[in-house]
Amino acid sequence: MQDDTSSEQNPTHCSAINSSVPLVQGALPTLTLSGKIRVTVTFFLFLVSTTLNASFLLKLQKWTQKKEKGKKLSRMKVLLKHLTLANLLETLIVMPLDGMWNITVQWYAGELLCKILSYLKLFSMYAPAFMMVVISLDRSMAITRPLPVQSNRKLEQSMTGLAWGLSSVLAGPQLYIFKMIHLENGPGQTEVFSQCVTHCSFPQWWHQAFYNFFTFICLFIIPLLIMLICNAKIIFTLTQVLQQDSNKLQLNQSKNNIPRARLRTLKMTVAFAASFIVCWTPYYVLGLWYWFDPGMLHRMSEPVNHFFFLFAFLNPCFDPLIYGYFSL
């Protein structure tokens, strides 16, 4: 979801972007009590997520060192490593940025960092969502269409590379649409407020609506649908297999039983999807509501607003707990 100072595009104001515009009607935003609570919770979750994800990366590194010479980590652990890196990136960029921005209320870092950090913020949100898609696809194919080990390795590398690449490309527009605006009391008077926003970056209001909706589809709807379809296929296939005669039970070269390790990773994949839904749904429901009814911010309690946004920060905290429990 993108920030903006107004729901309308004023041509006079738009011509003054990057210089200054008259102060809009109404009080400027300040750090309220609920805002302070949000900042406190944000930095607490930042410490939790950083500790958990960094610890899991360290554990994977030690696991790699214990491997016999010439042997590599399993495909699943490689995918978990990519997901952990993506979660760590989101933690180190999005959470401190959100916390500091809520403290300062306005933007003091200049236009260059406004663009760069806005790009990195969206990039670090795309990456973990796409990595969870890769894991869901990988587990689904491992159950329904098992391939030789070498083919699986190549497919895994292609999918993870595509996930990182798409994250980078889809976040690209942030470098263009985010700008600094400076508000002042009147012409020639002292500047009183600066902000990093998308104000006036779109010729028509529906252009911004389209961009926001496109981002919502790519960040939430598409990953969610893919994960749901993959998990449904996994559950359906396992149900069929478990209903067969135990003497004929065979899954991907395993005899007479489903390997426990594979069952663990399948349960983990389902848990990832559940975590994604629980953590991100409130965030995007609030975003969609705002896009169609900007006035809702004035009707909704500020603490409730902050609470919904904080839900999204739980996802990188839950993920290492999930894969730590199921994989090692």
From Swiss-Prot:
| Highest taxon, organism lineage | Eukaryota
Entry's transmembrane regions: 39-59, 85-105, 116-136, 161-181, 209-229, 272-292, 307-327
Query: What UniProt keywords are attached to this protein's entry?
Result: Cell membrane, Disulfide bond, G-protein coupled receptor, Glycoprotein, Membrane, Receptor, Transducer, Transmembrane, Transmembrane helix
A Pfam family name for this chain? 7tm_1
User: In which compartments does the protein localize?
Assistant: Cell membrane
Provide GO CC annotations from the record.
plasma membrane
State its role: Receptor for gonadotropin releasing hormone (GnRH) that mediates the action of GnRH to stimulate the secretion of the gonadotropic hormones luteinizing hormone (LH) and follicle-stimulating hormone (FSH). This receptor mediates its action by association with G-proteins that activate a phosphatidylinositol-calcium second messenger system.
Q: What is the official name of this protein in its record?
A: Gonadotropin-releasing hormone receptor
Gene that this sequence comes from: GNRHR
